[in-house]
Amino acid sequence: MGSEHSSEETQTCAKELATNINSNHSGILIDTIVSSILKVFQLGYNLMPSFSSSDNRETMALQNIQARIRMVLAYLIAQLGLAASQRNGGLLVLGTANVDESLVGYLTKYDCSSADINPIGSVSKIDLRKFLEMIYVKKEWGGLRTIIDSIPTAELRPLVDGKVAQTDEAEIGLTYEELSVIGRLRKPGGMGPYAMFVKLCQLWSDKYTVEEIEEKVRKFWWRYRVNRHKATVSTPAIHAENYSPDDHRNDHRPFLYPDLSYQFDRIREKVEEIKKEK
């Protein structure tokens, strides 16, 4: 589900990886959908948002609409994809938000992070890279190598001379290596802002000044605080690590149930029993 902001490299990586894992792959451009929605908005509010606007609300809205369209399309494809090829059944939508993105809210509410289940939702970006490295060593998939070496980017802003101008780490203000350390101090370390700052002064004493560490702690906790509302609609993730954003004590939102055939059989027996008594 590419757009005019998608780089050639990303599109090539997607195709190559699909070939490597023997998966069906199709390319769909969302630009016409984005334009149609924006025109409807313009009719009602007499405003056409632009990336060149000095109002950050416009640039954020333009990015968010792309992300949310991808969520809608993903569910449509999951529901009708097999029907289009004359096959029975339906598909599940998989989420793509990792631990670091979830903790700092670097995702759009109800975007492509919204899904039926998130297989990487409890794993950090650094550990995901390590996992991909392990797979690459075993399989030597060319598309995977390019993905591992690529700079993380949402690709929701216009390209500059055909190249990506937007990067995750620049927008977050923290590197994924830093987020991996901070995330573990939060959980399972159980540290709040002050305890985290004190600990990082020890861990990063040879890398940053205390003022720089203070700024990084402030950035993380500010993002964590203002974006925590997004966690209320986060897609259930597989519990793979102890630093997951989820509560591991129990699942407050159970959604995997047995078929209840035993209970239904007992109900049917009770119905027959009651009928006989009458």
Label every PLM stretch briefly.
Residues M1-K278:
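ATP/NTP-dependent adenylation/nucleotidyl-transfer catalytic domains that generate, transfer
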